[in-house]
Regions:
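Hydrophobic, well-structured mid-protein blocks that either form specific transmembrane helices
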Residues: 16-58
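Acidic, serine/threonine-rich low-complexity disordered tracts
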Residues: 1-26, 60-157
Length: 157
């Protein structure tokens, strides 16, 4: 990843020995220094992409806005406790079109070393059997960015 003049390569390899989740991690800095870590947990360990995919399986029918989902996440430089917050349901209009979806709204929260929480990504998945991610709002150090679904095929409905 790149952020300003910082350049990093983050890699994670997953395996599941003895019914545990093992995350072998490599973190390469711009100057070539490499940090490797190997962490194992009885709980599943996620990365940014896999936690969004996991959100597609959530049954939120009994959830109230504000529900917190705690999980372990690797960033290639270690495994940390992280949080998703269910924000409720919202109608999301797509960019430049007439299309709108009723969505589940979830926020990915990072907690710094002092315990202060910061919303990093808000993502929206359709509130139907498909649970398709249709929008991401990312809050970056240098501003913000949004990503929108532009098409999908093979959906169940």
């Amino acid at each position: 990843d790149m952020e300003g003049s910082a350049y990093r390569i983050r890699e994670v390899w997953y395996s599941y020995p003895d019914n545990k989740c093992r995350a072998r991690q490599s973190y390469t800095r711009k100057d070539g220094r490499i940090t490797e870590k190997d962490e194992t947990s009885t709980s599943q360990i996620y990365d940014m992409l896999s936690i969004m995919l996991k959100a597609r399986t959530f049954n939120t029918s009994q959830w109230k806005p504000g529900k917190r989902i705690n999980f372990l996440m690797t960033d290639g430089n270690g495994v940390k406790n992280q949080t998703l917050i269910y924000r409720g349901k919202q109608r999301v209009k797509m960019r430049g079109g007439n299309k709108a979806y009723r969505c589940l709204k979830l926020s990915f929260i990072e907690t710094n070393d002092r315990g202060k929480e910061k919303e990093v990504i808000t993502f929206f998945v359709t509130d139907d059997a498909n649970h398709i991610p249709v929008r991401l709002d990312m809050y970056l150090k240098f501003g913000s960015a949004k990503a929108f679904l532009t098409g999908a095929r093979g959906l169940s409905k």
